[in-house]
Amino acid sequence: MTKNSNHDENEFISFEPNQNTKIRFEDADEDEVAEGSGVAGEETPQDESMFDAGESADTAEVTDDTTSADYYFDSYSHFGIHEEMLKDVVRTKTYQNVIYQNKFLIKDKIVLDVGAGTGILSLFCAKAGAAHVYAVECSQMADMAKEIVKANGFSDVITVLKGKIEEIELPTPKVDVIISEWMGYFLLFENMLDSVLYARDKWLVEGGVVLPDKASLHLTAIEDSEYKEDKIEFWNSVYGFDMSCIKKKAMMEPLVDTVDQNQIVTDSRLLKTMDISKMSSGDASFTAPFKLVAQRNDYIHALVAYFDVSFTMCHKLLGFSTGPKSRATHWKQTVLYLEDVLTICEGETITGTMSVSPNKKNPRDIDIKLSYSLNGQHCKISRTQHYKMR
């Protein structure tokens, strides 16, 4: 289902959600001014760029808490995932611009980098004049981060601590700034946000800064007959055999892929806004209403979720979007295929609710409940579907 974006890789279009706050979305070298979004359920104009039972407790599968944690951290020991993130210019350059263009947030401050990986954010902070940076990384990449810090001459400024943020002891009672790239697919996959909130509550001084401090989740609907036929309907006849029993399971697995903006059929709606500096851990579990209005006559095969992130403490508000009309990121978008093909006419609406919560067995996974209805001229339907991101 991977599609090619119509705009040049260096082209960025303004994003205009409904809010009075101006946000300048950053890419590699170009700046665009846009407006942020605020209220769940309100229309968010398409992101026109910058701103993805019954098992035993002793099972050997990743559903066991200890095993799942080990699996999660081990996955970040591989160089490939760090290469992908570092080469994500939207992601990495935005953080760099936030730090370098707003040194007043970092200079002479004690900084905590949660989930430091290779230490790139810590290096940015050290170069921007941080008094000291504590880079916490649980995976084996922590050993490489120490070498990277030493190779770049910042051993006296950056201390790499290997371990879980919930288990390590910082050599300082408080920090002035917490920085982290905690976002996963669908914003919340891998549940690293909880670690950031833990660090905030334990170490951040009153009035301290969290970077980024705002995130929002959005929803739209797309036509995607070709890919759904290839990936879902495929199970109806496999070399002449009926394997349709797999379809329901396949439908429950959200697809992370890049969506062509030409596939978009409806407007986009804000599902959830999170203030990382104030929210509690439980706020990441939510039920939000939505109303998607068709922009043309077409078929709908899936709903698509994406997220935006912003840094509101900067001189000029910075951030980025992972939506279909933005420059592609390694997060891509999250596609939720519908059991039925919806025939919709321009102006008709799909209404419903989406419930999101961590999986009870493995809190790094996400359970999604989607209820939707369409009362249109050619299609009348009301259905509830369940999805599991893992």
UniProtKB/Swiss-Prot annotation:
The active site is at residues 181, 190. Pfam families: Methyltransf_25 (PF13649), PRMT_C (PF22528). Residues 69-390 form the SAM-dependent MTase PRMT-type domain. Transmembrane segments: none annotated. It catalyses: L-arginyl-[protein] + 2 S-adenosyl-L-methionine = N(omega),N(omega)-dimethyl-L-arginyl-[protein] + 2 S-adenosyl-L-homocysteine + 2 H(+). Interacts with PRMT12, MBD7 and FIB2. PANTHER family: PROTEIN ARGININE N-METHYLTRANSFERASE, PROTEIN ARGININE N-METHYLTRANSFERASE 3. Residues 1-10 have a biased composition (Basic and acidic residues). The keyword Transferase applies. This is Protein arginine N-methyltransferase 1.1. Belongs to the class I-like SAM-binding methyltransferase superfamily. Protein arginine N-methyltransferase family. It comes from Arabidopsis thaliana. InterPro entries: Arg_MeTrfase (IPR025799), Methyltransf_25 (IPR041698), PRMT_dom (IPR055135), SAM-dependent_MTases_sf (IPR029063). One of its GO terms (biological process) is methylation. Methylates (mono and asymmetric dimethylation) the guanidino nitrogens of arginyl residues present in a glycine and arginine-rich domain. Type I arginine methyltransferase active on both histones and non-histone proteins. Required for leaves and flowers development. Mediates the methylation of MBD7 and MED36A. It is found in: Nucleus; Cytoplasm. Keywords: Chromatin regulator, Cytoplasm, Methyltransferase, Nucleus, S-adenosyl-L-methionine, Transcription, Transcription regulation, Transferase.
